[in-house]
Regions:
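Active-site anion-handling motifs in enzyme catalytic cores
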Residues: 1-302
């Protein structure tokens, strides 16, 4: 059972978190539409780094402030994560979260650190893990291969480059696999691959989710430093190794036993992990707690 049932029988509005809630002119021109949002039965916030310890920052991922967030009051976190850009939660951020986030339900967060953040500002939260993991049941993971295949699709992260380590990763994959595919998740990833001088013989996958799904469904393995690229591969029942380049992957691997190798240890650890046999087992997901969280919303009712 996955998170999709929260939406299956309901009218859903989608608003981007990275753009401001609205301007006064937009409210005058689109008051009816915005009123539907303001009066929604449930407002769900999703996002890896939707929250931060200090919301007094330029271009916050959830682009709200204390003056314009009233329309989003009562928002409920769904598998939300938090970034740390200060040593503690300041007064402004605490006041903002207490104003905009619901006090009536328990929030769903993806890791213990985010749970503690919300608890520090006086809100209730359960660590349900990222909703993308909810379908990775023991029965699902049993269908994932224990040993490597002949082909692999890999990813890179252009905004977090490490040319020496990323070349080393590709070199390991060339030695272990007969055919390499590269999926550019964002617009600059292909240029980064080419800048490494490592694109020869690599087949480029269409830069869309459909393209990624298509190559995974051919039965290839996944190796790369795109966290959710790896999780998506697991959802498609493909063997996956995530290369950790930031705290998001490390936190989720620590809590849920995702198959992971540190980028700093690529040269020593990746080849052994690729070549060895191991089962995919996602630990730490509390299925009963997830069902308890969903039960707050009467999800079976249209």
């Amino acid at each position: 059972m996955n998170w999709c049932e929260l939406f299956s029988s309901n009218y859903v509005m989608r608003l981007a978190t990275h753009t401001p809630m609205y301007t006064p002119a937009q409210y005058l021109l689109s008051r009816r539409k915005l009123s539907i949002f303001k009066g929604a039965d449930i407002k769900l916030l999703c996002g890896t780094n939707a929250l931060y310890t200090n919301m007094l920052r330029p271009l916050p991922t959830w682009n709200i402030n204390y003056l314009n967030c009233g329309m989003a009051a009562g928002t409920v976190c769904l598998g939300v994560g938090a970034g740390a850009n200060s040593s503690s939660v300041n007064f402004y951020t605490r006041a903002l979260y207490r104003k905009v986030l619901s006090h009536d339900v328990v929030h769903s967060v993806r890791d213990e650190r985010t749970k503690h953040l919300l608890e520090r500002v006086g809100l209730r939260a359960w660590n349900t893990g990222c909703p993308t993991l909810w379908g990775l049941t023991p029965e699902h993971c049993e269908t994932i291969a224990h040993t490597k295949g002949d082909e692999v699709v890999f990813t890179l992260t252009s905004y977090h480059p490490n040319p020496r380590k990323d070349r080393a990763m590709i070199d390991v994959l060339r030695r272990s696999y007969s055919r390499l595919y590269f999926w550019p998740q964002t617009i600059d990833d292909l240029g980064y691959l080419q800048s490494l001088g490592a694109a020869d013989g690599v087949e480029i996958v269409t830069p869309s989710l459909a393209g990624f799904r298509e190559v995974l469904d051919r039965g290839v393995d996944y190796v790369g430093n795109r966290l959710h690229g790896g999780i998506f591969a697991l959802q498609r029942k493909r063997r996956a190794i995530i290369v950790a380049i930031d705290y998001r992957a490390r936190e989720m691997a620590k809590d849920y036993s995702l198959p992971l190798v540190e980028r700093d240890s690529i040269e020593t650890d990746l080849a052994d992990l690729v070549e060895s046999s191991w089962p995919t087992r996602i630990h730490g997901l509390d299925v009963d707690l997830i069902e308890k969280w969903k039960a707050q919303f009467d999800v079976d009712k249209p």
